[in-house]
Design a protein with these regions (language model features):
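A glycine-rich helix N-cap at a beta->alpha junction
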Residues: 107-117, 182-195, 427-439
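N-terminal amphipathic, basic-rich helices that act as targeting or association modules
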Residues: 2-102, 264-265, 275-282, 299
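Peripheral docking tails and interdomain loops at the edges
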Residues: 324-336, 444-446, 466, 619-680
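Glycine-/acidic-rich phosphate or pyrophosphate-binding loops and their flanking alpha/beta elements
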Residues: 257, 284-287, 317-320, 339-354, ...
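Long, well-ordered, tryptophan-enriched scaffold segments
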Residues: 15-19, 196-344
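Structural signature of the thiamine diphosphate
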Residues: 237-311, 432-437, 456-506, 661-680
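Cofactor-binding active-site loop characterized by glycine-rich and histidine/acidic residues
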Residues: 63-183, 357-358, 362-363, 371-372
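Non-catalytic terminal/interface segments that mediate subunit docking, oligomerization
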Residues: 87, 302-304, 308-415, 421-431, ...
Length: 680
């Protein structure tokens, strides 16, 4: 970014080495307390907030960069608007830490942890929080709806939508903007928080237009002179500086009359660009809005990671989202481990080198989903569509029609946004599109909107779709390789967030399934067989595995999927004294394989373990297939109930849901009526 594109550089850096005591921030109990401060004190408050954020988020992890960039903006909003009457709608919501601090929530010691503050807006925390979903581009539609409701009910007050330039690329934002312009009345303010980035630099035609608005040399030169010369020359100079802001719109039109034309043509009054780190300038712009009776868009220029050198100099994402770090250096505290995303990144690049027809798509998340290495080696074969998952899916269908095999890498919870396109654009047209679904299952600290728990149930409704759930590095590589060979239907490869487990080798392959563990034929209670000590013959059938000592024991088949493979093996071992157990990994969950249906017929019970919804999920699909095939083996399904999960660690959530080895063993014994031999 050119120097002229940045807000004016002032002394704003956070002193992380000593963390001096906070003097003003602890006095802010409600936004009304901000009215007691002059602008010099407000600037000091902004510095204290940045120090607090760096020190606090360094201990818990969270969205640091976005919040460092909106400190002055949030202060100014709370100074001019009244949250007891006006409504703030924060798009995505990851930039609301400052809002929380100013509305009485200053205990960040357990941020994003069980019992602590959410990392996103939360109505349970405060009436000032409205939009909780944390999925981008929805704020303008929400704001439009609230403004319409206010008019119908005769309620006063403004609706303020704060949306980033990245989220502004989403189709929902433009659909809402079209409706707002058509109505063209009401107290509705859109604050376009333009830092040139979402996770990475914002792309597309809108980004180019906003770049043009940022770079107006004459305009920037005039305002910079006013800031440097007038604000430092006492009360008279400040008065003149305010006058300069009063003439700002005219000055802008004189030096660059095309600015804001895109929004003006839509019927939205455009103001800006405004320095998002100048509280006085922001307050002046917001105050002018109060006299309007029609929607207004204020274009605010901010700097992601502002005031914290490690974030400012981190080119990849300016500390968009971090784990625990050393606040003085920004270096991570926890050692890095090889993660699922890195395996995907390595394997898709390997496959692309062998097949030039493989192309990749992302929705503004090139680095988080692991496509950056692909982009570096094959820049013409990666397409970033912005925050527009539905567009990505339909674009993938077009690429498939054109003879390529698109791989769309996306977070599981964001795949929900492209369901219609998956169904009608990809599946209906038998398009060979592979979806690599990162962060599937319970993710934890980011709360209800980020758990990737809906995908299997949704995907099960799509005709022809095939879905795989790898259990470790080797199976991720294998199943991704199998997926890109399918050229007449959509495929999904789902994998969780975080570090890889140790390798989980199979005893053998039976049809399409991997056998992971089984009670050996004729064994005494508690004996077991693992791949590392296996002497089982390849191709052994369920009938062959029965021994004289095991025939009397009830037969239990455990289908443990993906990240729950090791859990299934632990459960199987614990039940080996009471059941003749086999633990399998189905590998491909959808459609349910005929091999699994046939195998189920030879068992007294089938247990399914899945890191997804129980209702409509893998277990439900097995139950349906068995019924269709006149196989009446009972199916006991374990997974995530149909509810929104509060933020906590993944382990805490799984324990609460009873998805631990001990809890599952007790439940299976209870539901089957088979008591433990040791307890008998």
């Amino acid at each position: 970014m050119k120097e002229s594109q940045n807000p004016e550089k002032r002394e704003h850096h956070t002193e992380t080495s000593s963390f001096p005591a906070l003097k003003i921030l602890p006095l802010i109990k409600t936004p009304r307390d901000l009215q007691k401060l002059n602008h010099r004190q407000l600037d000091r408050l902004a510095g204290e907030i940045r120090r607090f954020l760096v020190q606090s988020v360094a201990q818990t992890g969270g969205h640091l960069g976005p919040n460092l960039g909106v400190v002055e903006l949030t202060i100014a909003l709370h100074r001019i608007f009244d949250v007891s009457r006006d409504v703030f709608v924060f798009d995505t919501g990851h930039q609301t830490y400052v809002h929380k601090l100013l509305t009485g929530r200053q205990d960040f010691s357990h941020l994003r942890q069980r019992g602590g503050l959410s990392g996103y807006p939360s109505r349970a925390e405060s009436d000032t929080d409205v939009l909780e979903n944390s999925h981008a581009s929805a704020s303008l539609a929400w704001a439009d709806g609230i403004a319409r409701a206010n008019r119908l009910a005769g309620r006063p007050g403004w609706v303020v939508a704060v949306i980033g330039d990245g989220a502004f690329t989403g189709g929902m934002a433009w659909e809402a903007l079209n409706n707002i312009a058509a109505e063209n009345e009401g107290r509705l303010l859109i604050v376009l928080n333009d830092n040139g980035r979402s996770y990475a630099p914002t792309i597309g035609g809108l980004a180019h237009h906003l770049d043009a608005l940022r770079v107006t040399p004459q305009y920037e030169k005039a305002l910079k002179w006013g800031k440097q010369t007038l604000r430092g020359s006492g009360p008279v100079g400040n008065l003149v500086y305010s006058g300069l802001h009063a003439a700002k719109a005219g000055l802008r039109d004189m030096v660059s009359p095309a600015e804001g034309a895109l929004f003006d043509e839509l019927g939205i009054t455009y103001t800006g660009p405004v320095d998002g780190h100048d509280i006085a300038a922001l307050e002046f712009s917001f105050t002018r809005v109060l006299a309007s009776t029609k929607p207004v868009l204020i274009h605010v220029i901010t700097q992601k990671g502002r005031g914290y050198t490690p974030a400012e100099t981190n080119i990849s994402d300016h500390f968009h989202a971090i784990g625990r770090i050393h606040p003085e250096t920004g270096l991570p505290i926890d050692p890095e481990r090889f993660e699922w995303t890195q395996v995907f990144a390595d394997e898709i690049l390997h496959l692309a080198r062998r097949d030039e027809k493989i192309v990749a798509l992302t929705a503004a998340m090139l680095q988080p989903v692991g496509l950056l290495p692909f982009k570096k080696q094959f820049p013409n074969r990666v397409f970033d569509v912005g925050i527009a998952e539905a567009d990505a899916m339909a674009t993938a269908a077009g690429l498939a029609y054109g003879g390529y095999h698109p791989v769309f890498a996306v977070y599981s919870s964001f795949l929900n946004r492209a369901y219609d396109q998956l169904l009608m654009d990809v599946a209906l047209h038998h398009a060979g599109v592979t979806i690599c679904e990162d962060r599937s299952g319970v993710t934890g600290p980011d709360g209800a909107s980020h758990n990737g728990m809906w995908d299997i149930a949704l995907a099960a409704t799509v005709p022809g779709l095939r879905l795989a759930a790898p259990r470790d590095e080797a199976t991720l590589r294998d199943e991704l390789g199998e997926a890109v060979l399918v050229d007449n239907a959509p495929t999904i490869v789902r994998y969780p967030k975080g570090s890889l487990p140790d390798p989980i080798p199979a005893l053998r392959r039976e049809g399409s399934m991997d056998v992971l563990w089984e009670s050996p034929a004729g064994s005494s209670a508690g004996d077991s067989t693992r791949a590392s000590q296996s002497n089982a013959e390849d191709g052994a059938t369920d009938t062959q595995s029965r021994g004289s000592g095991a025939e009397a024991a009830p037969r239990l088949l455990i289908a443990a999927t993906g990240a729950f493979a090791k859990l299934g093996m632990d459960v199987g071992e614990s039940l080996a004294g009471d059941f003749n157990v086999k633990v399998i990994d189905p590998r491909w969950l959808l459609p349910v394989a005929s091999d699994l249906v046939r195998a189920s017929a030879g068992y007294d019970w089938v247990v399914t373990l899945e890191d997804g919804l129980v209702d409509g999920g893998f277990g439900s699909q097995i139950r349906n297939r068995l019924a269709e095939s006149n196989v009446f083996t009972p199916v006991l399904s374990y997974g995530i109930p149909k509810q929104f999960l509060s933020h906590a660690t993944r382990g805490e959530i799984l324990e609460e849901l009873g998805l631990t080895s001990e809890a599952l063993v007790d439940s299976i014994r209870s539901r089957t009526g088979v008591l433990s031999v040791q307890k008998a």
